[in-house]
Amino acid sequence: PVKWEVASDDRFKTIVATGEATARPELGHSVHVEVTGLQPDRPYWYRFALGSDQSTRGRARTLPLASASPARLKFGVAGCQNYEDGLFTAFRHLANEDDLAFVYHYGDFIYEYKQRGPDYDKDGLPVDQVRHHVGLDCYDLADYRLRYAQYLSDYDLQAARARHSWFPTFDDHEVQNNWVSDNDGRDQSP
């Protein structure tokens, strides 16, 4: 089992919740933990351990009470991040923002297809991608898991995700470009 801890301080001197969860292969060896009893509108720190291996420390901020009326709410916004189009240095800047309540990610966390040729700059000259997707297009669960793992291997993205609570939503590329209902626009559905 994976052990987890939540603390009220970044050095884990005051542990406020602990537990264990099983990382199942059918769920991509991931765990989902719901922690109760936390105070509203404040940061907490968390970490995971499996045997002697320990995760990077993360920070999450709880929401204000539903009845609260905060005088100010500052949050980050991100989306449409194509791994092949550039480095994720903007996420490092987001990670360095200390006073964000959360990050809202409006979708296109991944791009499910591989670029087939060069992009073009403003003068119409070909420009190679900065880095390349592993594999081709995503068609099955294994393809999508590999693509997410590749995106999540970026250190700047890891830093931003460890620093702030995230509220993501989906757009088309999490499924397929321009996907609408039964009209998938490709020969094989994801």
What are these regions (language model features)?
Residues 1-190:
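Metal-dependent phosphoester/phosphodiester hydrolase catalytic core
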